[in-house]
Amino acid sequence: RMPCCGFLFAEKRRPNHIIREMVDFYQVPVYELNRIKNGADYVTPEGKTVSNNLLTRPSAPSRSYAYCSDTIYLPSIVEQIKGVDLLFHEATFANEDAPRAKETFHTTAAQAAEIARRAEVKKLLIGHFSARYEDENVLLQEASAIFPDTQLAKETLCVSV
């Protein structure tokens, strides 16, 4: 067997957005703006502290995506993918074929859903289905019973994160 790896893509945190009217009101010098965007309060020349939340509004939250395929059921990945916005996880077999999944180093739809549930991901996308299933909805039903926000990965599917 060859070791496989997954991928975790996570955006860097973006700086807060300056509220121009408030920066103008407090006459904040331009050289202070980067510090303020990164969370610092502003201290006026008179010594008054102006809270950062008066000068900025939060940026959109960072997004994250994890991809795990061609892998046996591996609960230890939970900590690495904790809280991702979207998880693609293989769901090669149905529960009734769990012994075959273990033998071939793959996972079942229920195992993929359990990983998603334990990792508290926002959305699960399952794929890499065995050709033995004419109707992949059986895999979707098994996964959805454990992790309701599950979707089948189909060719040309586009998912917003």
List where the protein language model places each region.
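Active-site-proximal loop/helix segment associated with metal-binding centers of metalloenzymes
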Residues: R1-Y67, T71-E79, L86
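Binuclear metal-ion centers of metallo-dependent hydrolases, dominated by the metallo-beta-lactamase
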Residues: Y73-V161
